[in-house]
């Protein structure tokens, strides 16, 4: 994955990390919450964590928004042949973050098989395709952006906004030439 694509993705997503307008007091638990968090599903066969592409993306995003604390979460799944386990972990993490850190701006991302996991999270609204705990209605309000790299699922489903309009305008889908 070209460094230029990662930098371009960070430039597109950085404005989406502007804080939520809020009239309600921030819960006490939010004091330890990051301003934004990237939940990233690594590519197939990569070791646990956010992976090479995810790490480069998070670092690029941090350099574009240095005034904001940006956490990262490596989706916990085997990264072998199925995206469903990654989608379930990502969905559970998003729901947990929304409950414990309601003002944290969430960025979902994935590379290769991890992009397919993120696709499941944003596309599937009922248990299906191995996703057992889809995001409840309204959860998209906590998601500032979706960044997909090497997303093979796009060839089958099309772009994310086509099947999940709530993410139109806040999704990027980068592929290398020939992907």
Predicted regions and their residues:
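Secretory targeting and sorting signals
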Residues: 1-25
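Extended aliphatic helical segments
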Residues: 7, 12, 38, 50-53, ...
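Serine-dependent carboxylesterase/thioesterase catalytic core
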Residues: 88-172
């Amino acid at each position: 994955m070209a460094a230029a694509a990662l930098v371009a993705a960070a430039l597109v997503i950085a404005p989406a990390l502007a804080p939520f307008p809020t009239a309600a007091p921030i819960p006490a638990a939010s004091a330890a919450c990051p301003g934004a968090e990237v939940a990233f599903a690594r590519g197939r066969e990569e070791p646990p964590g956010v992976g090479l592409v995810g790490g480069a993306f998070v670092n690029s995003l941090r350099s574009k928004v240095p005034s904001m604390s940006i956490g990262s979460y490596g989706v916990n799944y085997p990264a072998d042949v199925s995206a469903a386990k990654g989608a379930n972990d990502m969905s559970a993490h998003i729901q947990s973050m929304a409950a414990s850190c309601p003002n944290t701006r969430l960025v979902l991302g994935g590379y290769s098989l991890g992009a397919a996991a993120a696709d499941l999270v944003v596309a599937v609204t009922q248990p299906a395709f191995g996703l057992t705990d889809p995001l409840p209605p309204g959860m998209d309000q906590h998601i500032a952006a979706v960044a997909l790299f090497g997303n093979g699922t796009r060839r089958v489903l099309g772009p994310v906004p086509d099947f999940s309009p709530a993410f139109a305008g806040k999704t990027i889908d980068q592929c290398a030439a020939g992907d």
